[in-house]
Design a protein with these regions (language model features):
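Short aromatic/hydrophobic "clamp" motif used to bind/position activated sugar donors
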Residues: 85
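Acidic donor-binding loop at a coil-to-helix junction in glycosyltransferase catalytic cores
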Residues: 157, 181-194
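Conserved donor NDP-sugar-binding/catalytic core segment of glycosyltransferases
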Residues: 97-131
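Non-catalytic, C-terminal membrane-associated alpha-helical segments of glycosyltransferases
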Residues: 228-232, 246-315
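Short, flexible, basic/aromatic active-site loop/helix in glycosyltransferases
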Residues: 117, 134-155
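A conserved acidic beta->alpha catalytic loop
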Residues: 21, 38-47, 92
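Short, well-formed alpha-helical segments that are part of the catalytic scaffolds
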Residues: 11-25
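Glycine-rich, basic loop-to-helix element that forms the pyrophosphate-binding segment
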Residues: 64-80, 101
Length: 315
């Protein structure tokens, strides 16, 4: 059996398109469950999902009041009955063979503990030419057309569509924090990948388990959207370094902060003279995110959450 965990927050329009692709899987319905985790939505998500329960016996509605994708995914993982977990975003279209292909990768190599899946961007309208180099930043993932395995840290997982054995997920403490209230403070699913890489876990690649990630050009494919991704990545990078230092503001952290502040000042001036240089502008946003993390550390309520090594086993 395999469990699909779908966090959602006010994403009803996307969920209406995405959820039917999970009902259309080639696996028999008794061999998989779909757990929709409602993360405090104020739209009609609950009514929509509950209206489907009588027809789809493998569908489960779960409410998670603590905001953040990490918290929603963890709630779903605790609820899951299966040996294998699949984490999927609510704004994707998934091919009918998706779950069967993930299981095929596990069954072909019993040492495999996690599976990366193909993710492609599906734009609502034609995207601008300049966006091409940044598709990986938006989650596009492709390691080729053949099933492969790697334990040399060459494969990454993306929370849009990924799988992991439940026992491994629990042993490693799940995902790292991402949101605390309105604040992004951690590295979420990337932090979990780093845990797998730290022990050179065997990760499989399922090229035929596919997600088409529905994206809006006006939002995700805009210069502001890419800049926000870079800014958030900067916060996540600083969190990862802080975690590596055992959550101590030691000399390494202070040196990192000072260097990042100097880079921000330098690149800010450069951007004034090169306002159309997107690469330079996005790099500035990432370094600003690096610095912003330290401002978040000044908030006592955030600092307590940030310094938890294992947020999965804290209920």
């Amino acid at each position: 059996m395999i469990s699909v965990i779908i966090p959602t927050y006010n994403g009803l329009d996307m969920l209406r398109k995405s959820l039917p692709t999970w009902f259309a899987q080639t696996l028999p319905t008794e061999e998989y469950e779909i757990i929709v985790v409602d993360n405090r939505s104020v739209d009609d998500t609950r009514q929509y999902v509950e209206s489907l329960l009588p027809e789809h016996k493998n569908l489960i509605y779960l409410y998670e009041p603590k905001p953040g994708a990490t918290n929603a995914r963890h709630a779903g993982a605790r609820k899951a009955k299966s040996e294998y977990l699949v984490f999927a975003d609510n704004d994707g279209l998934f091919n009918p063979e998706c779950l069967a292909e993930i299981l095929k990768v596990y069954y072909a190599n019993k040492k495999c503990v996690a599976v990366a899946c193909r993710i492609e961007i599906l734009w609502d309208v034609v995207e601008p030419d300049w966006i091409a180099p940044y598709k990986n930043l938006l989650g596009q993932l492709n390691y080729g057309d053949e099933i492969r395995y790697d334990n040399h840290n060459r494969f990454y997982l993306n929370g849009g569509l990924m799988s992991v054995r439940k026992d491994v997920f629990e042993r490693l403490g799940g995902f790292n924090p991402d949101l605390i209230g309105p604040y992004l403070i951690g590295d979420g699913d990337l932090g979990f990948v780093n845990k797998l890489h730290a022990e050179h876990a065997l990760i499989g690649w399922a090229p035929n388990a596919q997600m088409q990630h529905m994206q809006l050009v006006a939002k995700h494919g805009s210069k502001h959207g890419i800049a926000l991704h870079c800014y958030n990545n900067g916060i996540a990078d600083s969190y990862a370094l802080y975690r590596k230092q055992q959550f101590r503001m030691n000399s390494t952290m202070w040196k990192f902060l000072i260097v990042q502040m100097m880079i921000v000042l330098k690149q800010y001036v450069q951007c004034m003279f090169h306002p159309r240089d997107l690469k330079r502008h996005f790099a500035l946003q990432q370094h600003k995110g690096n610095v912003r993390f330290f401002g978040l550390l000044m908030k006592p309520e955030l600092r307590r959450e940030i310094r938890q090594f294992d947020v999965y086993n804290i209920v």
